[in-house]
UniProtKB/Swiss-Prot annotation:
May associate with the eukaryotic translation initiation factor 3 (eIF-3) complex. One of its GO terms (cellular component) is cytoplasm. Keywords: Cytoplasm. PROSITE patterns: CLU (PS51823). It comes from Phaeosphaeria nodorum (strain SN15 / ATCC MYA-4574 / FGSC 10173) (Glume blotch fungus). One of its GO terms (molecular function) is mRNA binding. InterPro entries: CLU-central, CLU_dom, CLU_N, CLU_prot, GSKIP_dom_sf, TPR-like_helical_dom_sf, TPR_rpt. This is Clustered mitochondria protein homolog. mRNA-binding protein involved in proper cytoplasmic distribution of mitochondria.
Length: 1280
């Protein structure tokens, strides 16, 4: 199958005993095939299920009646929302629905509406407005008619939620690229060029038609008291396209034109021809402006050209912020005058702003307490939870940004800055620093910073477990302008002054670890938590050596709120310390404050094991337990034939145990009872606890040994195995820092082991060298991030851009200017700088910055960079990594990293990217000059010649860590569908998959990262079920949602584009497929650079697609490019290279280069012979081809004759199986027509079904695989 990007379902799949092909193929990019045959196409395309039927909606205005298909599983408010969004019913926003004269409650399910069935009639009844409804109606109408423009949002950055999907394949004028009759979309692709940043932005868009010049709240707003009593709600002023100004009254009955003007106030209805009234403002504007209706229709048509998902606002997720954005003068980011923009906060939340003040904690906890027995209850509960977390994350981040900028007064202004706390919008804020000395012995500020990050992960873990009656506070961590800020919902009673003798905490450590509380009501709750997280029940001792038995870590607190609920707090220590790392690299701070030795100066003691590692070690212990049990049973069976039983384990075990085999002669299988197995780790060992009794000491020693064994498992098993799998191509090779850290985390490997992995990767193998280069780049980016944060933290916001630009110049621009200058405005500096501002960044030089970053890498990752530094040619990739980590949004232009490019780049217009792929540069410059308006800034100041300027840093956005739980219901449905498909229950599987899709969309909303992953996974599964139309549609959606929620150049977005290309090709749209493949490859160059180890398969796919288009010469070029990378990655004498040589020889033959074909085939034959031996069938196949091609080269006439008979054959590029020639297959090429210039009766591009061709493209061999297994080229594997 093509790909599976749903991480959760991947881990669930790993824990299931599924052995069929669908579930075993974790490939992300490659191998769309028909492994699971499916002939039934009902299910998705058959009759509608019983709970879905059509009804009629009766309207008060034209068209008076519309049909609508509904599902009884939906709520009435879902139907209401659908009516609001339909083109014929745009104008309605304040209404209710009636059925048979009875009003329907908006908050019930449609299934609860009495007598509602097929062909029922629901009536839309317009309601009187109140002030809130009027405000929301005005907002909605402004958005509908395109008058709202772009909001300047403090949280969302420039072009947040951008999608390129609709503009891929368009040139800079916004029109499809002309390839010419003989060219393909890949015609001018340059394999070796660096990434072109123009591929990260859409071409300039044609402006949308204007329906109205402006509409805003009037200066006469709000209505005076005596008019409010008469039903006046708002006063508006509108300027039509005919330049007529109208003052409008918003009344409880609707909207009408009044007699007011800018100078006089008279809100009574106007007389004469303009005496107009309508319930909807949209209808009133249509009546007022003769051109409105036509313009509005044009606007709808303009918007209809775009995929709806690209323009919907994100409501349940924070949109991705691009790191490269257009300059302020670009047509993509024009800033238009709009008075209503300043009024939006009033329109959204009213005069008192009470609409937005929410009791977050009560909302979180009451949602948790909702019923979850029935499926519809679970759907409603999870849907509300998802929306609530999204709203909270949004509000908490906005508040954190205000705290970072110093715009909120602290509750304790006399305290030190790091100890200050804030409350804003019912959210409690504090700094991720050790302001009160809590972590004095653990590493101070560094320890506190790590602890709050781990706390978010802990809160998310507890939220996912969903333990009844155990509650958590809403938690968000925001990194902004160098500061780390924690936002938490306020737990009732947390600030309460306790009586003497009462403790602030009811379970766990109080005031350090001197006092330990152990309220018994927490025991059953923490017991469930600890069992799920493999935390061992253990004793701890307070300052008086009194023994307390705790279910969790002493650091994990329990608090009984004044609302009577039990809260779990401080969840940063759910796993044990990584004692091996701490003993090697940490030493306790000395009382004399002497400097620590360099080998023991790790910045903090909060180095814990990851939960994934604890789980993986637990599975290892289970395997050992089962093996011992099997051995015991085998020893008991003396005198009889030795049995090799198969262990039947629960889903908990997940994987086949080593040595399991079916009992040959036994009618029943032996079972291993694992109820006696238990595994848990004590999180408080090595944390200063001193056992008192001998019994406790012995138990404690055992616990310590177990934790040491887990640490040893990480260093001796997990990390080396991961490196081996990367070397052998068993897992997808990471593209960037994000995909690298994701790969490590899924294996349970902490980021602090980057240095160790780099050392272990320092071997001659090309894949390992590529891994080492990527890790070094990531360490530099992270080291720079830590240093940059330390400088940004103490700089006022107006100087942050100058600070960042100077730091970037020192990091990346040293070759262009060895002595960069910080561009701080001295006059502003004199006027507003305070003693707290630290301008030491101005004194930094490239040498001093390099020294600081190298020191950070040595400190945090225990790695000596030596002579290594930023790799030449990879400056753009490092700039991207740094920008994403710091939340930078840079102006799009060609940044010169050397003196030559800096000089040449000066002439390039800012909106345009430099020319790379072989087109005329001059034409593009001209186009950009005509499209982009000239700079309207103040006269240019003479700036020093350096790579980055302060003006290039257009914005800094927050980097957010949040604790939203996943939907268990949607995950369960997806997994059930996957299992059914794997067990060959195709119809049931398809039904479950589509149900899972519906659940994902219902619970998360459509625009959400989890939905993107679900679309991706489901598109692959549905393709294998032969539902190609649905698979293709979902593949398109996966791309758009990935772009908008993860980023246009996120690694998952690239894989989604590659998947989409394969599906388009399978559907017969090869040209469109190549456009998407090219875009993915261009993104790949920006993310990683040229020659990514896993791009071999993609280049092969493109080559085969070109052959399908009969572009034989171009196809040959792509095969050769793939071969070149394969030789670099796998070596010139590997079987992978031999197989690609074999394919390239065939491509050369199709291109009529017989001499080249013979040479390539001879190389292939020699490698097969040397590696596999003369008798291997692959060697014989190559030998047969070599003879045939040699004869053809000797006799041109014989060659043409052979080609005319269609004897040239092609082999599969295998994915899981080795890359080798296979046994003879039917002719699939039009070789005869290519060489002889004519078509024969049977000479078609493909005589097999498209599924078979797709198998060939993707590399899934239809024959029995050879037993010897080799590495890539292969499918891009989902990173486990």
């Amino acid at each position: 199958m093509a790909a599976s990007s749903n991480d959760a379902s991947k881990s669930a799949m790993a824990n299931s005993n599924v052995t069929t092909e669908v579930a075993q193929t974790p490939s992300k990019e490659q191998d769309v095939n028909g492994e699971v045959e499916a002939t039934e196409e009902d299910g998705a395309n058959g009759q509608l299920p019983d709970n879905i039927f059509q009804i009629k909606i009766k309207l008060p205005h034209e068209p008076f009646e519309i049909p609508m298909t509904i599902s009884t599983a939906e709520q009435v408010q879902d139907l209401r929302q659908s009516i609001i969004e339909m083109p014929n019913t745009f104008q309605y926003s304040c209404f209710h629905l009636e059925h048979k004269g009875q009003r329907i409650n908006d908050f019930v399910d449609l299934s609860e509406v009495p007598e509602l069935g097929p062909d029922s009639v629901l009536e839309v009844k317009e309601d009187p407005y109140n002030e809130k409804e009027a405000r929301l109606h005005v907002i909605r109408v402004r958005e509908l008619i395109g008058a709202a423009g772009d909001r300047t949002d403090a949280l969302h950055g420039i072009m947040a939620g951008l999608s390129l999907h609709d503009t891929v394949g368009l040139d800079q004028s916004g029109k499809p690229k002309e390839d010419g009759p003989e060219q393909s979309p890949l015609a001018d692709y340059d394999f070796k060029s660096s990434g072109a940043i123009k591929n990260l932005l859409p071409p300039p868009q044609e402006p949308a038609p204007k329906c109205i010049k402006s509409i805003a709240l009037s200066a006469w707003n709000p209505p005076p008291y005596h008019l409010r009593t008469k039903g006046h709600l708002l006063y508006l002023v509108a300027m039509t396209n005919e330049n007529e100004q109208h003052h409008i009254t918003s009344h409880v009955t609707g909207f009408y034109v009044n007699k007011s003007s800018n100078a006089s106030f008279d809100p009574a209805p106007r007389q004469g021809p303009k005496a107009l009234h309508a319930h909807s403002l949209l209808t009133l504007l249509e009546k007022l402006s003769p051109s409105f209706e036509a313009s509005f229709q044009q606007l709808l048509e303009h918007n209809a050209k775009k995929e709806l998902l690209t323009i919907f606002q994100l409501s349940n997720a924070i949109p991705a912020n691009p790191w490269l954005v257009p300059p302020p003068t670009s047509s993509l980011t024009t800033h238009q005058p709009d008075l209503a923009r300043t009024q939006e906060s009033y329109l959204i939340s009213g005069v008192e702003n009470t609409d937005t003040l929410r009791d977050w904690n009560e909302e979180f906890q009451s949602t948790r307490e909702m019923p979850k027995e029935a499926v519809h209850d679970r759907v409603f509960r999870e849907r509300l939870t998802s929306k609530l977390f999204a709203d909270y994350n949004d509000a908490a981040t906005r508040g954190a940004m205000l705290v970072a900028r110093g715009e909120i007064a602290p509750l304790n202004p006399t305290e030190a800055k790091d100890a200050q706390i804030f409350v804003y919008n019912n959210i409690f804020y504090s700094f991720g620093a050790d302001g009160v000395g809590t972590f004095g012995t653990e590493g101070g500020d560094e320890a506190a910073r790590v602890a709050v990050g781990k706390d978010v992960i802990g809160v998310r873990a507890v939220n996912n477990l969903d333990i009844p009656n155990l509650f958590t506070s809403g938690t968000v961590v925001v990194d902004f302008l160098g500061k780390r800020i924690v936002g938490q919902s306020i737990v009732p009673g947390i600030f309460k002054q306790r009586d003497p003798g009462e403790h602030q905490i009811d379970y766990g450590a109080v005031e350090g670890k001197e006092i330990v509380a152990d309220d018994k009501s927490f025991v059953p709750l923490f017991e469930q938590l600890s069992k799920a997280l493999r935390v061992k029940k253990h004793p701890v001792w307070d300052k008086d050596n009194v023994r307390h038995e705790l279910e969790g870590s002493v650091e994990t607190k329990g608090l009984i709120g004044t609302d009577g609920r039990r809260y779990a707090l401080d969840l940063y220590r759910l796993t044990p310390l990584d004692v091996a790392w701490i003993e090697a690299h940490w030493s306790e701070p000395s009382k004399d404050e002497d400097a620590k030795p360099s080998e023991k100066n790790y910045p903090h003691r909060m180095a814990t094991l990851r939960p994934e590692l604890v789980e993986s070690y637990g599975r290892l212990k289970l395997r050992e337990y089962v093996k011992n049990e099997i051995d015991k049973k085998a020893n008991k069976a003396r005198g009889g034939r030795r049995r090799l039983p198969k262990a039947q384990k629960k889903a908990d075990a997940g994987k086949e145990v080593d040595g399991e085999k079916k009992a040959e002669a036994e009618p029943e299988q032996d079972r291993v009872d694992i109820s006696g197995f238990s595994f848990a780790l004590n999180p408080d060992v090595f944390s200063g606890q001193t056992p008192q009794s001998d019994e406790d000491k012995a138990e404690w020693a055992k616990d310590e040994a177990e934790v040491r064994a887990a640490c040893d498992h990480l260093q001796t098993e997990v990390i080396p195995r991961m490196i081996t799998e990367l070397k052998d191509g068993e897992v997808g090779f990471p593209m960037d820092g994000q995909s690298l850290s994701s790969l490590l985390h899924k294996r349970g490997v902490n980021i602090r082991y980057l240095g160790k992995i780099a050392e272990l990767s320092d071997k001659p193998d090309p894949r390992l060298q590529a891994l080492k280069r990527l890790i070094v780049q990531e360490m530099i980016a992270r080291g720079f991030k830590h240093f940059a944060n330390s400088k940004l933290r103490n700089v006022s916001a107006p100087f942050s851009a100058a600070c960042v630009a100077h730091l970037l110049n020192c990091l990346l621009g040293a070759d262009a200017n060895a002595k960069p200058v910080a561009e701080c405005d001295e006059e502003i500096k004199r006027m507003i700088s305070t003693p707290e501002d630290d301008f030491s960044f101005e004194k930094l030089t490239p040498e001093s910055l390099k020294k600081e970053v190298i020191a950070q890498i040595a400190l945090r990752y225990r790695y000596d960079l030596g002579e290594s530094w930023v790799e030449s040619g990879k400056e753009l990739q490092l700039l991207r990594e740094v920008s994403l980590k710091l939340g930078l949004q840079l102006q799009t232009r060609q940044y010169g990293f050397t003196k030559e490019t800096l000089t040449n780049g000066a002439a390039v217009p800012t909106p345009a990217a430099p020319q790379t792929n072989g087109s005329s540069t001059s034409s593009k410059k001209k186009k950009n000059k005509t499209i982009t308006p000239p700079r309207a800034d103040s006269p240019a100041v003479s700036l020093p010649s350096q790579t980055f300027h302060a003006d290039d840093i257009l914005n800094i956005v927050p980097v957010i860590k949040e604790a939203s739980p996943k939907s268990l219901l949607a995950e369960e449905a997806l997994e059930a569908g996957r299992m059914s498909v794997a067990q060959d229950q195709k119809e049931l599987g398809q039904e479950l998959l589509l149900e899972s899709l519906q659940l994902h969309e219902q619970i998360y909303g459509v625009l959400h990262p989890e939905v993107a992953r679900a679309y991706h996974t489901l598109s692959n599964l549905l393709f294998n079920l032969d539902d190609k139309a649905s698979a293709l549609e979902l593949a398109h959606k996966a791309v758009i949602v990935s772009e908008r929620t993860l980023g246009v150049d996120h690694a998952d977005t690239v894989l989604a584009y590659l998947n989409l290309g394969l599906f388009e090709h399978a559907s017969g749209n090869t040209k469109a497929a190549l456009v998407y493949v090219r875009h993915a490859l261009e993104l790949w160059k920006i993310i990683y650079g040229a020659d990514h180890p896993d791009s071999i398969t993609t280049l092969n796919n493109a080559a085969v697609m070109l052959q399908a288009m009969k572009q034989y010469h171009e196809s040959r070029i792509w095969f050769e490019a793939s071969l070149a990378i394969c030789e670099d990655v796998s070596g010139k004498t590997s079987i992978n290279t031999a197989t690609l040589l074999f394919q390239t020889a065939q491509a050369l033959a199709l291109d009529k280069d017989m001499r080249g074909a013979v040479n390539r085939m001879r190389e292939s034959y020699n490698i097969f012979k040397d590696v596999l031996g003369a008798e291997d069938r692959n060697t014989k196949e190559a030998e047969s081809w070599l003879e045939q091609l040699t004869q053809s080269a000797v006799s041109q006439a014989k060659q043409l004759n052979d080609l005319a008979k269609g004897r040239i054959r092609r082999i599969q590029l295998t994915g899981r199986n080795p890359l080798r020639p296979a046994a003879a297959t039917p002719s699939v090429s039009d070789a005869a027509a290519a060489a002889g210039g004519q078509r024969t009766g049977t000479g078609r591009v493909d005589q097999r079904k498209i599924e078979d061709l797709l198998k060939y493209i993707e590399g899934e061999s239809s024959k029995t695989p050879t037993k010897k297994r080799t590495q890539n080229p292969r499918k891009r594997t989902q990173k486990p």
